[in-house]
C-alpha cells in the first residue's frame, strides 16, 4: 500500500486484548479511524475461524465506531498453517458489510499460509494476493478521495428497517 503512495499504520490488538486492554485499544483505534481512509483487518486462524481476540475487539470497535466506518473501504486477511482461512475472512467481512463499507478484494481469497512469518513469505501465491490487495486498496482509497474532490456525493442513506422474525 505504501508503495502506491498511501500511508499505513498497524495496530496490533491481539496481545493487548489478552492483557485486558480491550477498552484502551478500541478507543485508540476509534480515535485513529476518524482520519483513516480505509482499514485492513487480519487474523490468524485458530480452530478454523478468526481468533477470539480479534472478534472481541471488532465487536466492541464496531459497536462504538461503526457509524464512523461507513463508506470507508475495508478488507480482511487471514493467515493459517492449513485450513480455516475462508471462514475467517467471512467472519471478518461481516463487520464491513453491516456498516456499509466497500469490501476490497484481490485475485484470490485474501489468505496466506505458513506456521511462521518465514514460512508465510515463501507462500508465493499468498504474497502475490497480498500485493494485489494492497494495490486495490490504494486505488479505491485514492478513487474515493478523487471523487470527493470532484463533488461526487455519497449515496443517500435510509433509516434502518429492523424485522423481528418472531412477531
Regions found by a protein language model. Name each.
Residues 1-66, 121-167:
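N-terminal beta1-alpha1-beta2 submodule of the flavodoxin-like/Rossmannoid cofactor-binding fold
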Residues 69-113, 117-131:
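Short, glycine-/small-residue-rich phosphate/pyrophosphate-handling segment
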Amino acid at each position: 500500500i505504501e508503495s502506491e503512495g498511501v500511508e499505513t499504520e498497524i495496530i496490533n490488538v491481539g496481545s493487548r486484548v489478552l492483557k485486558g486492554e480491550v477498552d484502551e485499544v478500541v478507543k485508540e483505534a476509534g480515535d485513529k479511524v476518524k482520519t483513516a481512509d480505509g482499514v485492513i483487518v487480519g487474523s490468524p486462524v485458530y480452530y478454523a475461524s478468526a481468533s477470539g481476540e480479534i472478534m472481541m475487539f471488532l465487536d466492541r470497535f464496531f459497536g462504538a465506531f461503526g457509524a464512523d466506518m461507513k463508506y470507508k473501504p475495508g478488507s480482511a486477511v487471514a493467515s493459517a498453517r492449513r485450513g480455516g482461512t475462508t471462514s475467517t475472512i467471512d467472519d471478518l467481512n461481516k463487520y464491513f458489510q453491516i456498516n456499509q463499507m466497500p469490501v476490497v478484494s484481490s485475485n484470490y481469497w485474501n489468505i496466506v499460509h505458513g506456521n511462521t512469518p518465514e514460512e508465510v513469505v515463501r507462500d508465493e501465491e499468498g504474497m502475490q494476493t497480498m500485493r494485489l490487495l494492497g494495490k486495490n486498496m490504494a486505488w479505491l482509497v485514492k478513487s474515493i478521495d478523487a471523487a470527493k474532490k470532484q463533488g461526487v456525493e455519497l449515496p443517500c442513506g435510509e433509516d434502518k428497517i429492523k424485522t423481528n422474525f418472531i412477531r
